[in-house]
């Protein structure tokens, strides 16, 4: 929500504007329903559907349906986390480039892990993880901080207060740290997929600069434990 | 000898990052080839740089799928009469269908049988992005390319070592004031001369091709000339002389000598070539037929030839490629093992080998 400014309008019209307006809102009529992207639901014959699903199907016959956003795909290989990460990597709306960088990163991870797999002795081969998606998800999970810091001003001074983080915020911070680390701390000639694959494999093994950053944040939160009572939410 | 088991599967080349990847795959192919023909296995391997997409590094093996066009070529080569003038085969097809891999398969087959293989991995590299162009000392109008010539000579030496000792020069060659190769010296000396004095590398290539052409008519050895991207020899170049005027292909020594090799005025071998639109210059991306890519000049020069079409994967070939990727752990996504995943890959790639490889890379 945001307060609208009406700098050029005369006072009578300014009184007509509401005090707060929604920043992100939808032009759809409330009667519009969300689209169903799950293929399996359509392949089930009518008799096997449960009661609520039958009701939903009947509702759909009467109500209009919203258009599906282009980021959702019914492909079996699509992953919402990977899409979110690709969007964060994207610059100036160049989704083609961001997607190809992501594909190259996953390929690099796969190649490095396959090499490690072939070099490992037979009894250790089972432990080498070659699936780039598993490595990606695990690395992100390892990079997520548990507790964050928030600025609270009391009596003129600003304190860093430890605060629990929501899931979305944790995921966002992990992805943001990963991308900024790969953009800034690399040699001019190394490419993004190479650096990203290196960082993801390190984060998967719980080592590397992003894990260190997470630990530094945790230590700061631990150090500022005294101010925790400043939090009111 | 060649194992014709259909279960042997291929990873088609990645043509998106540039044609240097062709070179690497073919270089590592030549290393696989020379391992069979000669015993020291480590020596050839050390020379070729391993590229990131090198299958030997990732899978510890390099495989080729046995497909119909290659088998067709093998029957033709087996039944060809080597007393007749040499037959030219042109492998053509849409982008990414496996023309270069078919050529590599034929090269491997002939090398196993003990032929002398003159393999030019990509003729397009000779007509573009050339850093050093020098005026040829032999003929004032022509231009030399020392880097490309020395690179090719090095690979030639590695793949055909024992032939270099057997073939003797039939005339004296004078390289400069103090260097000359006498008549009757082994061809290896000419190659060494080209490699040590890089200025004479293009002329050394010309001498090698001339000697091989003259001597293979006698019948002591068979020669396979394998050129990838033969349409580069008759197209246009992006090179410019010092006065910024454009260079046409016949003004380059390497191209001139290679054109003479691809003519059918000698006998005792075969010429297998591939058309390639991907590296070609000034050709639209929809052009894949011989007439479109070779142009009038090239078509007349190569005419008569045996055209060999390489189509997309059939159902069976797609299945075997998919199962190979699963077997060598290239497809790692859990959903890729399911029927839905397979159908999705089949639909998205349209059974095109290159598309399938590009799609399965991040999966």
From Swiss-Prot, chain A:
Biological-process GO terms, alphabetical: mitochondrial translation; ribosomal small subunit assembly; translation
Key word 4Fe-4S present: no
One Pfam family here: Ribosomal_S7
An MF annotation (GO) of this entry: rRNA binding
InterPro entries reported in the protein's UniProt record: Ribosomal_uS7, Ribosomal_uS7_dom, Ribosomal_uS7_dom_sf
Top-level taxon of the source organism: Eukaryota
Chief location: mitochondrion
Matching Gene3D superfamilies: Ribosomal protein S7 domain (1.10.455.10)
Keywords carried by this UniProt record: Mitochondrion, Ribonucleoprotein, Ribosomal protein, Transit peptide
Subcellular location per the Swiss-Prot or TrEMBL entry: Mitochondrion
Transit peptide boundaries: 1-28
Gene Ontology cellular-component annotations: mitochondrial small ribosomal subunit; ribosome
Family: Belongs to the universal ribosomal protein uS7 family.
Known partners and oligomeric status: Component of the mitochondrial ribosome small subunit (28S) which comprises a 12S rRNA and about 30 distinct proteins.
Protein name, entry field: Small ribosomal subunit protein uS7m
High-level lineage: Eukaryota, Metazoa, Chordata, Craniata, Vertebrata
